[in-house]
Amino acid sequence: MGTNDRVRTTPERIRLPESGECGAKKAERIPIEGRSKAQRATEIIQELIGQFSLATLLEILDLSRSTYYYQVKRLAAQEDQDMALKELIQSIYDEHHGNYGYRRIHLELRNRGFIVNHKKIQRLMKRLGLKARIRRKRKYSSYRGEIGKKADNLINRQFSASKPYEKCYTDVTEFALAEGKLYLSPVLDGYNSEIIDFTVSRSPDLKQVQSMLEKAFPAKSYSGTILHSDQGWQYQHQSYHHFLENKGIRPSMSRKGNSPDNGMMESFFGILKSEMFYGLETSYQSLDELEQAIADYIFYYNNKRIKTKLKGLSPVQYRTKSFG
């Protein structure tokens, strides 16, 4: 079968002969989607020009030589226009250590005054080979059975709050290096996902949690505040409940072995570890270095890392904009 015998195709699909054959076998189908047919056809030709002759590709795609060269010039001009945008996308991606996908880069560009379609951001990131990191899950549990006082689940997975300090969340997570382990105990505000305060310790003891409470809740009274946790032994301890009672804070606990009940903390720990720990463990030379990196990340998370659910703002920006 010669080239002239091939059936011309609709704008939706094209049919190409297999390399080195006359097209007797079933040919690969390639979709022509988006933008103009001539522009997309030109892009396909540029992708396949090393495998087939230009004349063959032009005939199969029903594209004149003059139109092809015109589109090549247009694409080159468009590439020049996109160069500055690609450099900015790369800069944002690098600034956030490869943790931003196209959605958050789109929001960050909007915050900087650039109005660009999110699909274009996605397309340019693909060309640049930029992909956001995938989160890994590894759960640390401090549960040691029913050894103290428990509390009802007052949250029931209704995590969001209408104002700061209405619903707060806490938990402990573990970081393991060859030298030893660190334990992070933060308090997160359900209003804007801000880390109110935190402690880092070499051991997950009661002193760490007591210090965390004192740092996160320094005022005399917090009437109307709920502090939700899992059923870890620290949160069943009498001193924990005594502190909350004195501050007017109501305790709330997840059901036994049900980590999604504390989804706000689970989400934060997942973000934290995927963005500054998993895959980077060997880069930390000591526990002191890791501890400083955790503190630096939490500052970054609160003040710079934008969240889609906060309208493209960081937790502190969202709180400041809402309450001044």
Describe each region flagged by the PLM.
Residues 2-324:
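Charged DNA-binding/catalytic regions of mobile-element recombinases
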